């Protein structure tokens, strides 16, 4: 776990774990790109729906997106089960931090939005989750890894 809890050192992994980690990351990133296209098509990103893609292609895109996320989850599971308790605790801290960030920052945005005539979209909620993940990873790093 490097960069003050923001990343793991991939070069330190054994070849099988490295392959599983990179495969999971690749599938998740490709799935995320397709999710972005899908969200833009349906207008969930705050703008009007684009509706530029024919429905059969949009259906194929959605199926491939879901498959990529499931394949990524499979490789991530294969990677995670071989890791030690420290890494699994780190991963849990990051996800709990993300959920906390979503609840505190995301729900605060929602509660305050009518007063500022600002209506959060997917990006703002994702940013709230990402901020919480960074806080969770950094807190774990400070508590368990950093040398005083």
Q: Which residues does each predicted region cover?
A:
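Alpha-helical propensity feature that highlights long, continuous alpha-helices across diverse contexts
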Residues: 1-82, 86-148
């Amino acid at each position: 776990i490097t960069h003050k809890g923001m990343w793991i050192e991939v070069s330190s992994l054994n070849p099988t774990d490295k392959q599983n980690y990179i495969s999971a990351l690749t599938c998740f990133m490709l799935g995320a790109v397709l999710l972005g296209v899908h969200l833009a098509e349906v207008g969930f990103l705050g703008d009007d729906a684009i509706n530029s893609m024919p429905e059969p292609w949009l259906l194929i895109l959605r199926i491939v997106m879901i498959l990529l996320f499931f394949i990524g989850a499979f490789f991530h599971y294969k990677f995670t089960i071989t890791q030690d308790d420290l890494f699994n605790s780190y991963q849990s801290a990051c996800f709990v931090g993300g959920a906390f960030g979503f609840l505190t920052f995301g729900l605060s945005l929602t509660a305050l939005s009518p007063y500022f005539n600002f209506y959060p979209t997917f990006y703002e909620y994702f940013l709230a989750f990402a901020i919480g993940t960074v806080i969770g990873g950094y807190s774990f790093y400070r508590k368990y890894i950093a040398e005083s």
